């Protein structure tokens, strides 16, 4: 999942560099990537046990950073509305 998210973000940035429309792709990145990262970080926390929650490892800081990204530029629910409007049109969403 993480590699898929990475490639999707790189493709979105490429579209932006080419001055092509990329609003829906950007919404997918903003809505999908933080959720995937939270899942990956939670797996890391489970793997490391209670030591993963301490400040000795950077995992807890990364979890806080990603949780901030979940609400930055709109929550995942807002991003899903943007994607649906792009796919189905404003009159349906």
Located regions from the model:
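Alpha-helical interface subdomain recognition
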Residues: 1-93
């Amino acid at each position: 999942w993480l590699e898929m998210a990475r490639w999707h973000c790189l493709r979105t940035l490429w579209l932006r560099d080419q001055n092509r429309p990329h609003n829906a792709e950007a919404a997918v990145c903003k809505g999908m990537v933080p959720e995937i990262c939270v899942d990956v970080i939670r797996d890391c926390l489970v793997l490391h046990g209670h030591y993963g929650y301490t400040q000795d490892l950077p995992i807890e800081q990364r979890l806080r950073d990603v949780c901030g990204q979940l609400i930055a530029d709109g929550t995942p629910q807002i991003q899903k509305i943007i994607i649906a409007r792009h796919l189905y049109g404003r009159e349906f969403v």
